[in-house]
From Swiss-Prot:
It comes from the Bacteria. SUPFAM superfamilies: MetI-like. It is a multi-pass membrane protein. It comes from Bacillus subtilis (strain 168). The keyword Zinc does not apply. The chain crosses the membrane at residues 21-41, 81-101, 116-136, 142-162, 199-219, 260-280. This is Protein LplC.
């Protein structure tokens, strides 16, 4: 400790600290500035966007792009659909992934290796888009919310990571719980899951971001526009704004600027995830270290 303290008090140590701060500050600026530009652009006018005459703050503040997006008839309904799919889909994925990973982590479970090999096989060789579509259709899931949830219920890669985490839990905890009369299911619910809070928070964030940003599965399985998630509606808004701009209606002030709508759509689609992250941050940092340290 004394050597470390002395190093930081030397000239070389202070130079290193300054360079480290400048480097990390530069990386932070490179990361944050694009987001600030997008936010500022969503509030800028058409002329400013065309001339790129703003940086962090627009010269003329306008809400036209947001008014146009929020005035879309299906916007609020699609927002509710996305929230429902994200919450339910995340819960379903966490439930199936953890309940499958726990028995796979137990060496005494019969057929464990066969099932694990099937999981790895499905990760390396997926069924493909058309076969998956035919399965969804045969199950009667087309044009239902479950078509956006059940086909992605288990992620093989995440399953293997969580299985490895359960294998690292001390066996003494399980043995002590069983001595106290706890069943295998009781050990899972009362011992393994409470110790898995950082893991649950980490994968909940991963699953939620994936479901929230997904529009491809809705494009495949949902034909009813009343059941479109937010990403599909925002995609349609962007396409319509492109068509309107191509026809020259934007110059007649029929709609807000094409680029402004796109930037507003990015902000709207990103804000919910940014709002959730601070609440999971303390668990997220721990969960990222899954499997990196043993003992």
């Amino acid at each position: 400790m004394a050597e470390i303290h002395t190093m930081h008090n030397t000239k070389a140590g202070r130079v290193f600290d300054v360079c480290n701060i400048l480097f990390l500050g530069g990386v932070g600026a490179i990361t944050i500035l694009p987001f600030l530009y997008i936010i500022a652009g969503s509030f800028a006018t058409e002329a400013e966007l065309a001339q790129r005459s703003f940086f962090i703050f627009p010269k003329t503040f306008t809400l036209d792009a947001y008014k146009y997006v929020f005035s879309t008839p299906t916007f609020l309904r699609s927002m509710g659909v996305s929230i429902f799919i994200t919450v339910v889909g995340t819960a379903v994925q966490l439930f199936f992934t953890f309940t499958m990973a726990y028995p796979l982590a137990k060496r005494h479970v019969k057929g464990r290796n066969l099932l694990l090999n099937l999981v790895i096989f499905s990760m390396l060789f997926s069924g493909g888009m058309i076969p998956t579509y035919l399965v969804v259709k045969s199950l009667g899931l087309l044009d239902t919310y479950w078509a956006l949830i059940l086909p992605m219920a288990i992620n093989p890669f995440n399953l293997i990571i969580i299985k490895n985490f359960f294998q690292q839990l001390p066996r003494e905890l399980e043995e002590s719980a069983k001595i106290d009369g706890c069943s295998e299911i009781g050990v899972f619910w009362r011992i393994a899951l409470p110790l898995s809070k950082p893991v649950i928070a980490t994968f909940a964030l991963f699953y939620a971001v994936g479901i929230w940003n997904d529009f491809f599965h809705a494009l495949l399985y949902i034909n009813d526009s009343a059941k479109w998630p937010l990403q599909m509606v925002l995609r349609q808004v962007t396409i319509l704004s492109d068509l309107t701009a191509t026809n020259g209606d934007t110059m007649q002030n029929a709609v807000p600027p094409e680029q402004g709508i796109k930037l507003a759509v990015i902000v709207i689609a990103t804000l919910p995830i940014l709002a959730v992250y601070p609440f999971l941050q303390k668990h997220f940092a721990k969960g990222m270290l899954i499997g990196s340290v043993k003992g």
